[in-house]
Every structure is written in structure tokens, then in C-alpha cells.
Regions:
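Charge-dense, helix-prone N-terminal extensions
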Residues: 1-123
Length: 123
């Protein structure tokens, strides 16, 4: 897979106030995972989504939102946990997939920002 779509998503998401990343080199199945969180990098914060190195992105949403995203074709059930009530997934294979992934990240970002309040940009 071309890494540019993942880099493009990272540049955009890290440009949002209060978003930082946390890298896990030994994610599920031995695949590296980059999680994007909202809050303070020192104390942590809720994840707005994560991307596996193979381009598989996962997001947790309220059940109603997750179900609507899947019904509308904007997301798919999680491949390993298809019966999860809150986890939606999205495949990033090319630059054409970037807008859809950013939409899901932005939805969770806005939800977290509303719930947790504004935060200063973390460097």
C-alpha cells in the first residue's frame, strides 16, 4: 500500500486542536497501530480513532451512529469483531479513501470535543 494516504490523514488530523498521536508497534495481530487522541498528551485522552499499518482504520461510536454509518455504506463492521455494537471500520487503500476516513475522524473529534470541552493544542 502507498503510505501517502495515511500520511495525508495524519497531517490533517494532527492539525486539529488538542489532537495527538500514540504509536503502538505491537498492535493486535502484530501489526503496528497509530492511535489519535483528543486531550493532553501528558495525561492522555480519549481516542478518536486508530489506523493499522495495513490501512485498516477503526472508530468507536455510539451504537446508533455506528449502525447508521454501516447502513449508509460510510463504514463497515470491524473485521475481527463484526458483532461489536460500537466499533466501525474503514479501509484506506488509496487517496480516494482519504475523505471518507477524515469524515469519520472528524465526527469523533467533534463528539469528543463537545463531551470533553476545548483543549489547548498539544505539541
Amino acid at each position: 500500500m502507498n503510505d501517502e494516504p495515511l500520511a495525508q490523514i495524519e497531517r490533517e488530523v494532527l492539525g486539529w486542536d488538542g489532537v495527538f498521536k500514540k504509536r503502538d508497534e505491537d498492535g493486535p495481530g502484530g501489526i503496528g497501530v497509530t492511535g489519535y487522541r483528543y486531550g493532553d498528551a501528558e495525561t492522555g485522552g480519549p481516542q478518536i480513532g486508530h489506523i493499522h499499518d495495513d490501512g485498516h482504520a477503526d472508530f468507536r461510536f455510539p451504537r446508533e451512529v455506528r449502525d447508521e454509518l454501516i447502513r449508509s455504506g460510510r463504514a463497515i463492521p470491524h473485521p475481527a469483531f463484526p458483532n461489536s455494537r460500537t466499533t466501525a471500520s474503514y479501509r484506506i487503500r488509496s487517496a480516494d479513501d482519504v475523505p471518507g476516513a477524515l469524515e469519520l475522524f472528524r465526527m469523533n473529534y467533534e463528539r469528543r470535543k463537545e463531551r470533553n470541552g476545548p483543549t489547548a493544542k498539544v505539541g
